[in-house]
């Protein structure tokens, strides 16, 4: 039986693994161990003679061929961005597919058999479009993508597969090349369930590399008066040296940085030769590492947990190999991290375990992911009405009944948005469609059932059905938006920043909606009442409705509230009078019927009865 391999398609590095005889094994790259261990750099390059290079060979020639080299393509997944290389253009899916093709080839060489099925991981914050783009990349590479799963979830599988004896609250600290993801999960009875996610899209190993680069460049500038950061070739060499030093200082106390012929001046060639200690590295990266507290606190808040309630701490990503990073996070949470898994390999191993679960090779594990942002429909006044809240476990299917806003309305527009803001316009539009053929009826009568269905890959399907006619329309949310992980973080920050402003805006819209409903209700009551309401009262209430509608149009909330209170009170009084009148008429009619049915001649007739002996 063919294997399902697990793939960590990373921004900086990629890796793959497979379960053999019940044990996860990392698939070695054909080039052997690189600076990233068994993982290989997510680089794709095209030479001027038309050759394509992937992985370490592409990275090695980047200095000499910068215009033909592409890296960090993952950041553009789910967008319509095109990478321009010489006279050709490539989509992010194509570049990712080249990386996946290399993985496929390496896996087939390692296993000695065709490999066609895969589980691919994505960041927890990836939206529907980015997940779909990742799946498309797998298809382009020749894979049948069986599942798209979140990277922190995969890591938890890697650490937890042999430790399913009791219930756990797990915090996954995933610090990669460019981003930090903090995920809190609940584990029990073989089920992993994501409780919350948080992160920082501008915090990662590259920030640490940049701090080292600046230290070296500042030192050189002080001595030579030259800023090497302005020379692209010199900068790339500095960056590579900084990354190498950072990795070496995870296991040693000092390392030498030797960069001969870094630049040339009128006085001749210049060189860099210096020693960097672990203590100096820790001093340089300390301000960067301190920023992890915010995302950790947010994740704890989202999961409604205290630091003391976390029972397992899992590290993922190359920078978590740095002793200072590990100690800082462990001290902040007051718990030692789990060992036994290389943080650089954890995600690929977890994906491989999920592949084995799907194949039935590993049993008694169930994987439950969550949707990172709230999914809503736009309703009257531009309000985003939530259907599926953020951090809802997927797969999930939820429905809600809506109605029409106008009399005899035969078409409704379903506008799907994603985000945490109360108003639709402040969120990201995922798509829209029209449901036509609704049976004409007064507003508020038709019943439109809107259903959001998210599958196990996080792909969203939306349908709308008119309950009366059975008319149905739907949409699958694919690449219709350019929402990135950065935008998700921005949206969450904006949601906090503008919370009070949003609350007031939403309250105003709801007030105006309620006012319009009251005006409509009063008009309908007066029309239905006919001559049961005297002419003078009708005119007075009609004028009040006109005044209210004018205030609604002017969006004068204070005036709207005053007029609503008066109109509500007046219509209630009219309603009470109509009820009393109807009640009096009913009693009068009942008495009349009683008198008429008593006797036709007005005499009382005694019934005869015989006593039973």
Curated annotation (Swiss-Prot):
| Region called Disordered, residue ranges | 578-613
Family matches, as Pfam families: HSP70
- One annotated GO molecular function: ATP-dependent protein folding chaperone
- Alphabetically ordered keywords of this record: ATP-binding, Chaperone, Nucleotide-binding
Provide ranges: composition bias, Low complexity. 580-600
Mark out the compositionally biased spans (Basic and acidic residues).
603-613
What's the domain of life for this entry?
A: Archaea
Gene3D superfamilies the record matches? 1.20.1270.10, 3.30.420.40, Actin, Chain A, domain 4 (3.90.640.10), Substrate Binding Domain Of DNAk, Chain A, domain 1 (2.60.34.10)
InterPro entries linked to this entry = ATPase_NBD, Chaperone_DnaK, Heat_shock_70_CS, HSP70_C_sf, HSP70_peptide-bd_sf, Hsp_70_fam
PANTHER family reported in the protein's UniProt record: HEAT SHOCK PROTEIN 70KDA
Q: What protein family does this chain belong to?
A: Belongs to the heat shock protein 70 family.
Q: What does this protein do?
A: Acts as a chaperone.
> Can you say what this protein is called?
Chaperone protein DnaK
The record lists the organism as Thermoplasma acidophilum (strain ATCC 25905 / DSM 1728 / JCM 9062 / NBRC 15155 / AMRC-C165)
